[in-house]
Amino acid sequence: MELPHDKAWAYLLLTPPPLRDYFIQLPKPATLQLALNRFAAYLEKQYLRDSLYMEKIVIGTHYNVRKNRVLQPRIFVSPSNYTRILSTFYDHPDLIAEVLPIQHLSKSQLKRGGLTKNVLTSGLPEMNNEQNPYAVFEVNTIDDLKACFAFPTEWLIDILTGRNSISLHYTIDRTSIPKWYAHLEARFQYSDGVTKSLTDADLRQHYIGVQPIPVTCEELLQKMNDASINGNTMYRVHGYESIVSSRMETVNDLVKASGKPYDVVNVQTMSSYSRSISKAINQAVTKDRHNKHVGSTKLKNSQGPRTTIFVMPPYITVDVVCSPMTIKPGLGPIQTKLLKSIVDQSPRRFRIAYAAKPQIEQDVLNKRIFSTDEGPESYFQGVELLTPEAKSLLTALPQLVGTFHYEKLSYAHFPSYRLTAGGYNVDYFKRGVTVIVARKHGGKGMVAKLIWKLGTPVIDSDDYGRIIKLVEAGLTIDDAVTQLFSMDYDQRNSTVSAFDEHMEMIVSQSKMKQEITYPRASDPRITAFADYYSKWFLKVPYSDYVASVKNFVTKNGLSGPNGIQSTNHYDTLVIQVHTLPEATQFLGVNNIIEVYPIIDSYIGMILRQQTSNTCAELLLARYYESIHLRNFDMLPVGVVASTLEALVG
């Protein structure tokens, strides 16, 4: 059976049949890049979760209906080289775990959808116009087959969903396209056998016309000029109150200077800004659903049509030029090998974006050259990197020797307002109870030390595990809290968590090799730990733990870093957690935000060796990630850190 040569949709490799059927109803992109853009545009509105190849995927349609689906296996066909590939296939354990060789697939296997694993075969049977439910790819060598798994699915989905701050568009533009993308572009069989055309108008209609698009201050100026020409369009402008253009003009300044009676909605925080965007999108989609045509953001009122505009804040972008890097002596063999790989692949020049705050701008302008010995915190305050190699390099800086200098300071606007959710206004750290969600080695420690300088006590994310260890020893929750939080800051942080201790025990007793790599959620050691975590999560409810901590802090205060002592009240209290289950177990919370770094937290854990068993730490981090859903405002650590530094002076 000859494989079709239609241009394919690159994202369909990652989608199960229900989602694939949804995409096929839309116009077909003519190029690979348009397919990737569409995939990214869709996933920016959805949450997609991948744990391996038989993962549960959370899918949300325009109607916000969520269902669990299973990712389908793929079929890899090699009509002329099957025997040659098979001769070396069993020399590759990674492929054995992922692919099952079946030389002759039967029609019944495809018809009943009986495949439970990716398959390598010499050819496909005739289907007699019946539907093949699996995606099909042609491979000619063992390297072609390996390349289909060389671009980690989980890493790609991290990028697409914003769990890492690298944009898919930048990734594809600046790195080579994986071979499986090229295969997919050329050889995919549509499940309905229909080829549809695509025009720019179609793409705009499906992915732009249905929602209000955030604009930059510069674009707002142009829109105002256009409006003054036709004299008919009114604008409702939404903007965070401190958003400025690259010429340092605020939204209010621009509107006043235009002389037009536009409505300006100034919001106090970027989280409010993001919620207003979501509300407008829902209104547009609802209108589209009822009127059977693409929704417009024009709202009818007595003054005529009014268009909603969302104005994006700018970022400062700089090119960073690196000197040749060397590795600091005295590190272990695993760390040295990883650092050598990072240094060999690291770019000599990369671009980084910072939150557009005056102190960052002055630092960039006044401090042109700096050394890796001056502390890595300022590097981590960026909000966007354009390449994964630069991300690895920034993560490794504390273990490297070298210098940098800045070039080409400019302003830029990123199209994804996801990066600004939560915003620059962190005054809520000064009042009420705030919960910060962050992965391990995700910048919590740096943020906590800055918050402590405001006089606000911070409860560390590992304190819950430390309390459980004391409860295991026979103490009540209240007695355990009293014992732990009566210690000074350094003593408290040096106390071992029950979770770290138990994961290390599981790893030491397991017969599996202790690999220092990114773990899979299906790892049996993670499954074993999940039983332990669930048991103690029920025995020591997080709500009871927080209530006891609040009571203790109210009566006694709390010791912080560098001799800081909080006052004896918890009107302002920050609680750091690892996961959504912990963050949602108690009431009386003023704000819940999630922070994420631009560095690679897994590489960071390998290099810093905070615990005695790095393998156990990686597994524990992977478990926290596997039970966490991102339902909160996403806020770059760089935004929080730069704003807090401005507040504390």
Curated annotation (Swiss-Prot):
Species per Swiss-Prot/TrEMBL record: Cryphonectria parasitica mycoreovirus 1 (strain 9B21)
Reported function: Minor inner capsid component. Displays NTPase and RNA 5'-triphosphatase (RTPase) activities. May function as a cofactor of polymerase VP2. Associates with microtubules and plays a role in the formation, structural organization and morphology of viral inclusions, where the assembly of cores and the replication of viral RNA occur.
Gene that produces this protein: S6
Transmembrane in keyword set: no
Keywords of this entry: Capsid protein, Host cytoplasm, Host cytoskeleton, Inner capsid protein, Virion
Coiled-coil intervals, chain numbering: none
Gene Ontology CC: host cell cytoplasm; host cytoskeleton; viral inner capsid
Protein name per the record: Microtubule-associated protein VP6
Localisation per UniProt entry: Virion; Host cytoplasm, Host cytoskeleton
Keyword ATP-binding: no
